Amino acid sequence: SSAASDVYKRQAHACSLLVDEYGELAARYDKLHLFDVDVADNRGRYRESDDYAHGANVVVADTPVGKLGLTVCYDLRFPELYSALRQAGAELITAPAAFTAVTGAAHWEVLIRARAIETQCYVLAAAQGGTHPGPRETHGQAAIVDPWGRILAEQASGEAVLLATRDSAEQASIRARMLSLIHI
């Protein structure tokens, strides 16, 4: 309904924006899965739904390097979303994040590698790190993972630009040998 649409437009969203080579907005993804959890850290309780509305759409955009699927942070814990991105044609998937220090140390690398393997996509994962108001402490690690689950480039903390070569022939070979999409 239009009333629901108006409410959606007025609420804040945690989103990922894709800007093209001309500086124009090419795609926008509003985070589907809000971080409403309790963590054994100095903050304890996180409730993104107090401040944000969840999104409604899976987003895959054409880019000069391939079809790019967009996600945000906690979305990483939902393989169904990543599967939907793959089914929509994604070849690479972004995962900008702010995992807590506790959850990031335990799960970050495992999750980014698992999503790459499951989808047979490159995962481009960047996580802020450090101490923030609230108090909130984030894990911080950036990595590029290939469709076989290998970490091609990585930065444990601090600022960095990561580069890796996308081997589309190898990606096609992996996808041809492991026909995971037909088993969904």
Language-model segment annotations:
Residues S5-D6, C15, Y122:
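Proline-centered loop/turn at the N-terminus of a beta-strand
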Residues R10-A88, A101-G104, W108-V110, A176-M178:
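Active-site catalytic loop in hydrolytic enzyme cores
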Residues K67, C73-L162:
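CN hydrolase (nitrilase-like) catalytic-core segments centered on the catalytic cysteine
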Residues D20-E21, S168-E170:
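Non-catalytic surface loops within mature trypsin-like serine protease
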Residues A4, Q11-H13, Y29, H139, ...:
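A structure-centric signal for secondary-structure junctions around beta-strands
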Residues S1-Y8, I184:
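Short, small-residue-biased leader/transition segments that mark boundaries at the very start
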Residues A169-I182:
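A short C-terminal boundary segment appended to hydrolase-like catalytic domains
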